[in-house]
Design a protein with these regions (language model features):
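Acidic, glycine-rich flexible loop/linker segments
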Residues: 1-36, 40-46, 50-182, 186-200
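Conserved alpha/beta-domain cores
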Residues: 139, 149-497
């Protein structure tokens, strides 16, 4: 939705953040995901206000009309998830100070409490302390005509980032040709699953971890079956578990007490494990393929879920499904080889048990600069590269994607940067890494599949660059798919020889 233009004209913004996800929202302020879900269940419209969001806030983000965060950039958790849901989000609003425990926020000296009404504009980052009427957009038949023209012209595939059947259906409605990124971690945060993943993390032995993972297997398999049933024979790329494990552990005293009672584990043991898993820089720590190396049983469970789901849907529906399993955060070919061996061994067991086989692909995200620089070696094991340009930009620039919103704003104002590199790919620097990886990857494996799944996949300038670099597809949030289709057509026309 957008704001009613007449009402918007009379309103004055009290703060301005980053326009992280377009649209408009108006509602009562809530400061926790649980409060957002409870209020929405009572029919209230709410805006979720957080210092910053994490995967455990997902239910509240779904329930809210919009999201406002005091910290975070254009590729922060709040921004990426909100864009994926087509939900309004203003991120990195430094004028807002959040006091979650007191259920209030302070904006330039003025206090706002839970239940006060605000309006936020994700298109320009404005925050208002009054209610502004929202208007739902309408699509005319002309939209379909233009999209058909674009599809007739373009030579670049367009996929969507989708984590569940609902998002997958939305993606298909917008014309996506497959799923370029399914983030499996989002599936773990539902109420009946989070205790099981926490039990696995708190386990003291491999056998205990395997027991906890066995409880998660049916849920993961069901999730993947749902995706395959919606997508049919279209490609689906599923990323193995990526975030550090500490993100799944309880943060509040109440949650720690509940977990302690549920599993008969002392509060001290839970707190000790939380301290053990604490990292000073978790985004460069124990995450991605490093989890699959140290805890191969996690990759085994996820591989079994992916392949068993595909086998069952192929048998039930008669579809020819070719799963694409993506290993995240690879920086060394030996890491990928280790995890790929785990995947292949698990696949053999799955096929023997099912009495049937199917083809599958194993590839990796190119998101660490070293992976781009050694892409010739990594292509020995990877059947596809998908460029994770959010992290590649973060590591290439040395910019934290969650903490540099204000710095980037200053740099743009001072003429140091032309655009936010997290919104539009830096073609001179990060683009060089992408180009180098494509060229050296093709030297090793001429038929390697190349795509991009970072948020840059919905940016027109980046799409043209990726087309010229020789990628086969881009992937973006479902609501950005029409823009990507149009931009792909424009890139094809502009670069005709």
């Amino acid at each position: 939705p957008t704001f009613d233009s007449a009402e918007l004209a009379t309103a004055t913004a009290v703060a301005k953040g980053l326009p992280a996800s377009p649209g408009a929202a108006c509602g009562e302020i809530v400061f926790s995901a649980d409060d957002a879900a409870e209020a929405a269940a009572l029919g209230k419209k709410v805006v979720l206000v957080r210092e910053e969001t994490s995967p455990e806030d997902l239910a509240g983000m779904v329930a809210a009309q919009g999201i406002l965060t005091a910290r975070g950039g254009m590729t922060s958790h709040a921004a990426v998830v909100a864009r994926g849901m087509g939900k309004c989000c203003v991120a990195g609003c430094s004028e807002v100070t959040v006091h979650e425990s007191a259920k209030k926020m302070v904006v330039n000296g003025k206090e706002y409490h839970e239940g006060d009404v605000i309006s936020i504009n994700g298109t320009d980052g404005s925050v208002y302390d009054v209610a502004i009427k929202t208007v739902s957009p309408e699509l005319s038949g002309d939209f379909g005509t233009i999209m058909k023209w674009a599809d007739d012209v373009r030579n670049l595939g367009v996929r969507a980032n989708a984590d569940n059947p609902r998002d997958a259906r939305q993606a298909l409605e917008f014309g996506a040709e497959g799923i370029g990124l399914c983030r499996t971690e989002h599936m773990f945060f539902e109420d009946e699953r989070i205790p099981k993943i926490r039990r696995m993390i708190l386990a003291d032995s491999e056998s205990e971890r395997r027991e906890a993972l066995a409880g998660l297997l049916p849920y993961q398999k069901g999730d993947f079956k749902g995706l395959y049933e919606v997508m049919g024979e279209r490609p689906v790329t599923i990323r193995l578990l990526d975030p550090p494990l500490h993100e799944f552990l309880p943060k509040t005293e109440a949650d720690i007490n509940q977990l302690s009672e549920q599993f008969g584990i002392s509060k001290e043991a839970i707190e000790k494990k939380t301290v053990e898993l604490h990292e000073f820089n978790p985004m460069l720590g124990h995450r991605g393929c490093r989890l699959a190396v140290t805890y191969p049983e996690i990759a085994e469970m996820q591989t079994e879920a992916i392949l068993t789901a595909a086998l069952e849907v192929a048998k039930e529906k008669g579809y020819k499904i070719k799963p694409e399993i993506m290993v995240p955060l690879v920086g060394n070919v030996k890491e990928l080889r280790f995890v790929k061996n785990t995947i292949d061994e698990t696949a053999k067991k799955c096929f023997e048990k099912a009495g049937m086989e199917l083809e599958y692909m194993v590839g990796t995200m190119i998101e660490i600069p070293r992976a781009a620089l050694t892409a010739d070696e990594i292509a020995e094991e990877a059947e596809f590269f998908s460029f994770g340009t959010n992290d590649l930009t973060q590591m290439g620039f040395g910019f934290s994607r969650d903490d540099t919103g204000n710095i980037i704003k200053e740099y743009i104002n001072d003429g140091i940067l032309e655009r936010d590199p997290f919104q539009s790919l830096d073609q001179k620097g990060i683009g060089k890494l992408v180009k180098m990886a494509c060229e050296s990857g093709k030297e090793t494996r001429p038929n390697i599949k190349l795509g991009v799944c970072g948020e840059h996949g919905g940016d027109p300038d980046t799409i043209e660059f990726m087309y010229k670099t020789g990628l086969q597809y881009v992937s973006c949030s479902p609501f950005r798919v029409p823009i990507a289709r149009l931009a792909a057509a424009q890139a094809t026309i502009k670069n005709r020889k």
